[in-house]
């Protein structure tokens, strides 16, 4: 059996690593970032503090937050318009699955002339993309469940058909991911439980998939072990 493995995403892990957002932007030569997060997170004190720190480093921080869970194509279009209006050169995608998916899609679509649905994960549709103008992405997840921060796709709903589509391109993959456990502490017990079960489901799916590789199984089993060990405590104590 022949397989290829790579882990191209740079992961910055640890408590309060979110304070390194400015450094992450500098590493990617981002001078005018678009901060993308959903309307439920934008007014939280911790998010306001992060934006305030970014404002100390950049002349201006442009924010796009006009979306909630299960984003639609029009949300991405509006975000792309904001990206171009303010002449941004990179995206900070902040939040749970929706914030990450929308941020990644905005960075990707900012360099495209086709509709987003032309890049659905079907065959070689991804080869239609203009790869030269895809903006760099920094992902900052606030939940443990989706894994979107290391994924090459976004889940976006087509509002006309009411069907959720998977939009794919290798460059959907963020260049830097900041994994700061402090950002998960304010989640409600219900959301902590739901995203924890999502993480468990991803690991079970990987372990039970027909294709086998010992590295994948090892990662999946360790993920299951960690979920069993810590999820109940996280739900109870944050």
Identify the residue ranges that each predicted region occupies.
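Glycine-rich nucleotide phosphate-binding loop and flanking beta-alpha elements
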Residues: 19, 98, 144-146, 185, ...
